[in-house]
Amino acid sequence: MAEENQTPATATEEQQAVLQIQRIYVKDISFEAPNLPHVFQQEWKPKLNFDLSTEAKQLGEDLYEVVLNISVETTLEDSGDLAFLCEVKQAGVFTISGLEDMQMAHCLTSQCPNMLFPYARELVSNLVNRGTFPALNLSPVNFDALFMEFLQRQEQESQNAESSTEVQH
């Protein structure tokens, strides 16, 4: 009888947030050292160019693929010769549900890449090591700060667009 007095869960109740890793994998990997062994005969004064980006796409209901793209290009300061170019696309499939739009954006551009970064960092380090170059240990990335910068840029662009629209009237 006590069970009859309980109300069943309704669709309007808040859904609990879910973030689960389904799979982590290497989507693409490349290591190029076109000027070997010539660069080994020069003084090692590297100039490092590091690029990072993310991509996300929905695969199905509550299922998303997130790709973390890392590119490290190292040239020698004195000669400008390319020492190596290392590109890694570390990806993961995630189950994500119960999030508002802004929370979902944060999850796809910050939380998921944060989970992928250690795998990508290890790949880059191993590839550089296999090329017999000095160790390269990428510093941790604050994806939350990058997400906040992105939001601020969007807000600034929105304000600039509104200002130019007001001036045209």
Curated annotation (Swiss-Prot):
UniProt keyword Chaperone, yes or no: yes
HAMAP family for the chain: SecB
Name the UniProt record assigns to this protein: Protein-export protein SecB
Quaternary context: Homotetramer, a dimer of dimers. One homotetramer interacts with 1 SecA dimer.
NCBIfam families the UniProt entry points to: PRK05751.1-4 (NF004393), secB (TIGR00809)
Predominant subcellular localization, coarse grouping: cytoplasm
Protein encoded by which gene: secB
Record localization: Cytoplasm
